[in-house]
């Protein structure tokens, strides 16, 4: 029986025309931390698009490659690219078995993309994936609704809280920003 690789928390928050995405660095197999400094975020399409993943690293890299091809094909049109990626991911016999979730964002939109064909744009400009995603989402939602903190500070605090609660999330956090 194959043990499941568990990881991570990746979050994206939009506020005041700024987009901040962050991901922790922990990769866990069973009860063992395999790596504490994994990089789960990428800048794509001439640094105009942020992307993060949760799930299998090899699968995520395969998806990043496909997604970059879609961005080139559709001249950086994020919404069209994510819809086409989701369609291909769901219908392709090989891609269908990939185990990962993607968060992608530009200055106008943020999307969660899954292999089930889901393309979700969050209502409040907050979305998080991975085992710590629900904790980070809850913290970010409370901070966005009740404070004037910047998107960066909201993401920092949300990742800190997720790392304190989720055993598959650490405090070694990488950030990417767009304005």
Swiss-Prot record:
The keyword Hydrolase applies. Its EC number is 3.4.25.2. Gene3D superfamilies: Glutamine Phosphoribosylpyrophosphate, subunit 1, domain 1 (3.60.20.10). Coiled coil: none annotated. Keywords: Allosteric enzyme, Cytoplasm, Hydrolase, Metal-binding, Protease, Sodium, Threonine protease. NCBIfam families: ATP_dep_HslV, PRK05456.1. This is ATP-dependent protease subunit HslV. It comes from Solibacter usitatus (strain Ellin6076). The gene is hslV.
């Amino acid at each position: 029986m194959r043990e499941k690789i568990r990881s991570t928390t990746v979050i994206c928050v939009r506020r005041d025309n700024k987009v901040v995405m962050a991901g922790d660095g922990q990769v866990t197999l069973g009860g063992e931390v395999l790596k504490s400094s994994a990089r789960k975020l990428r800048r794509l399409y001439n640094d105009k698009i942020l992307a993060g993943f949760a799930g299998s690293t090899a699968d995520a890299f395969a998806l990043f490659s496909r997604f970059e091809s879609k961005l080139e094909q559709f001249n950086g049109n994020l919404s069209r690219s994510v819809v086409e990626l989701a369609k291909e991911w769901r219908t392709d016999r090989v891609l269908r078995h990939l185990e990962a979730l993607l968060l992608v964002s530009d200055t106008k939109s943020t999307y969660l993309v899954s292999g089930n064909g889901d393309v979700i744009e969050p209502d409040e400009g907050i979305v998080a994936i991975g085992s710590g995603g629900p904790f980070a989402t809850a913290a970010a939602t409370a901070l966005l609704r009740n404070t004037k903190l910047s998107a960066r500070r909201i993401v920092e605090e949300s990742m800190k809280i997720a790392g304190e609660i989720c055993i598959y999330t650490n405090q070694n956090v990488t950030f990417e920003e767009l304005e």
